[in-house]
Amino acid sequence: MSRKRTSPNRNVQIADQIQRDLSELIMREVKDPRIGIVTIQSVELTPDYAHAKVYFTALTGDPAKTQEALNHASGHLHNLLFKRLHIHTVPTLHFHYDQTIEKAVEMSRLIKEANSTRAKDDDEADAAAKDD
């Protein structure tokens, strides 16, 4: 007897639905003061839907405390998702702070710094060439 395989497209659809539902549920149902303004950036599901990595950013508050609070509320959120989603297995939620924005800002800063250093070196080289 062969097992029915889920399509990658269905996995993406369910992950997107979980992302939308979690965004709403966190805002309306979770009352933990450690959780400020949170945006769910993405959800990655395992193929069997047993686990979901939920990536978030926090506009306010400490990201580590927010992550701790979200992971503490994950059981409650799991139960609320179970009532909304019409799938056999609702994944166990694992929240992770998404550092993409901070990394992008740091990369931009490094590029800007490198460009200004290069421009300064070019100006010094031009000045030295004029002196010769």
Curated annotation (Swiss-Prot):
Q: Which Pfam families match?
A: RBFA (PF02033)
**One Gene Ontology cellular component annotation held by this UniProt entry:** cytosol
Fetch the InterPro entries from UniProt. Answer: KH_dom-like_a/b (IPR015946), RbfA (IPR000238), RbfA_dom_sf (IPR023799)
GO terms (molecular function) for this protein are:
ribosomal small subunit binding
Keyword Transcription included in the entry's annotation = no
**According to its UniProt record, where is this protein located?**
Cytoplasm
Per the record, the similarity remark reads:
Belongs to the RbfA family.
Its subunit composition reads: Monomer. Binds 30S ribosomal subunits, but not 50S ribosomal subunits or 70S ribosomes.
Tell me what this protein is called.
Ribosome-binding factor A
Its source organism is Burkholderia lata (strain ATCC 17760 / DSM 23089 / LMG 22485 / NCIMB 9086 / R18194 / 383)
Q: Name the gene behind this protein.
A: rbfA
